[in-house]
């Protein structure tokens, strides 16, 4: 599959699962099961619930994806977790 066939979306990590898997809530409201790309794994980038990430989806299966980038936090320390918790409730 070519790189241009993939769909890029942004979302928030809602849950950390075993084996470096994460559940991500996309901006359109869909829940996606994702894993970490090789570059993130090699560079030891830590991804936690509440982090904003860029996800790459295959057009063949829109329920699974790959986290390709962790976006910078727009808020001061601690506020993003509060926003995340209020969003979940």
Swiss-Prot record:
UniProt key word Chloroplast: yes
Residue stretches making up the S1-like domain: 1-72
Gene: infA
SUPFAM superfamilies linked: Nucleic acid-binding proteins
PROSITE patterns xrefs: S1_IF1_TYPE
Function (record text): One of the essential components for the initiation of protein synthesis. Stabilizes the binding of IF-2 and IF-3 on the 30S subunit to which N-formylmethionyl-tRNA(fMet) subsequently binds. Helps modulate mRNA selection, yielding the 30S pre-initiation complex (PIC). Upon addition of the 50S ribosomal subunit IF-1, IF-2 and IF-3 are released leaving the mature 70S translation initiation complex.
GO molecular function terms attached to this record: ribosome binding; rRNA binding; translation initiation factor activity
Protein's name in the database: Translation initiation factor IF-1, chloroplastic
InterPro entries: NA-bd_OB-fold, RNA-binding_domain_S1_IF1, S1_domain, TIF_IF1
Family recorded in the similarity comment: Belongs to the IF-1 family.
Record text on subunit structure and interactions: Component of the 30S ribosomal translation pre-initiation complex which assembles on the 30S ribosome in the order IF-2 and IF-3, IF-1 and N-formylmethionyl-tRNA(fMet); mRNA recruitment can occur at any time during PIC assembly.
Location (main, coarse): plastid
UniProt xrefs under PANTHER family: TRANSLATION INITIATION FACTOR IF-1, CHLOROPLASTIC
Disulphide bridges: none
GO cellular component annotations of the record: chloroplast; cytosol
Signal peptide: none
Location in or out of the cell: Plastid, Chloroplast
UniProt keyword annotations, A-Z: Chloroplast, Initiation factor, Plastid, Protein biosynthesis, RNA-binding, rRNA-binding
